[in-house]
Design a protein with these regions (language model features):
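A short beta-turn/loop motif at secondary-structure boundaries
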Residues: 42-47, 71, 139-140
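Conserved catalytic-core motifs of GNAT/GCN5-like acyltransferases
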Residues: 115-117, 127, 132-147
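Short amphipathic alpha-helix that is part of the acyltransferase structural core
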Residues: 2-52, 56-60
Length: 150
């Protein structure tokens, strides 16, 4: 997709505007849209090895993923807080975000499996990228999830 500008930054590299935008997108999706009242901010965001992958169209943040190093959430690197702004969904941006996330993780932590906690209804979506289900369904913040590995 043309006209997208990608950045992959550590927390310390984000300016105030970028930080506000990505936190707003996460809150809008994970707390407001999904009606899931949980602490969105955690210390994982500020860890030196954590990366914040963002996609901008013009000057607007439209997609975001948080890339976590091995040992922070799982023994393997992981992708989380995967978010696409509602006005640009179903245009292939989520697929581009996943492809870019996988590329960045491969650069940062080569030769590692990648583990995610996926909402159960999105299992087939993640299977398209090579993830396989490795757990039974469990509830995370009241939403059915499965652990998946690539």
């Amino acid at each position: 997709m043309k006209n997208l500008h990608w950045q992959c930054n550590q927390f310390q590299q984000l300016d105030n505007h970028q930080l506000y935008e990505l936190m707003k997108l996460r809150v809008d999706i994970f707390i407001v849209e999904q009606k899931c009242p949980y602490p969105e901010l955690d210390d994982k965001d500020r860890q030196v090895e954590t990366r914040h992958l963002t996609a901008y169209r013009d000057s607007s943040l439209i997609a975001y993923a948080r890339l976590l190093p091995p040992g922070l959430s799982y023994p393997d690197p992981s992708i989380g807080r995967f978010a696409v702004e509602s006005s640009v969904r179903n245009q292939g941006i989520g697929s581009l975000l996943m492809e870019k996330s996988l590329e960045e993780i491969d650069k940062l932590w080569p030769d590692h499996a990648i583990r995610i906690s996926a909402q159960e209804h999105l299992k087939e979506y993640y299977e398209k990228f090579g993830f396989i289900k490795v757990s039974d369904i469990y509830l995370e913040d009241g939403i059915p999830h499965v652990e998946m590995l690539k």
